[in-house]
């Protein structure tokens, strides 16, 4: 059986409901040469009796079997990562250029994003011993991948608008 015919497993603890089994064809710069073969939204593997959570799963295949390195995240965390991504992209597009090192060393907090009656702090990780170099590399990667990211952001914006957000 060729890999493109391989289906995401349904007999494991994560129970797929919605799948993208051809994700390997669109996995950014790794398209067609990735071990990430699919994505799914389904019932979380950690569900307790009477409590059902939705999770997103990244399915990786080693060539012989589905990898234990496949990642599963609760759906709200996927959205929180999208929020963190969007706020970070906005920061690097509109604010980071103002600072010689790409961030304000005295005030590394970028934003406080309101969620659930509290807020998620978005900040440059100044605990990282190589943060100046890593910010530079991060900015270069954002620049290099601008077209890939932009395509996904436009699609996300379009879908959110279509959904009434």
Task: Identify the role of each PLM range.
Residues 1-3:
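Short, small-residue-biased leader/transition segments that mark boundaries at the very start
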Residues 5, 9, 18, 154, ...:
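C-terminal tail/extension regions appended to the core domain(s) of diverse proteins
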Residues 8-48:
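Short N-terminal edge-element motif at the start of the domain
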Residues 36-72, 93, 100-115:
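A short, structured beta-strand/loop element
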Residues 76-87:
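Elongated alpha-helical scaffolds
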Residues 89-99, 146-153, 164:
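Long, hydrophobic, amphipathic alpha-helical segments used as structural scaffolds
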Residues 107-162:
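Charged/polar low-complexity intrinsically disordered segments, enriched in acidic residues
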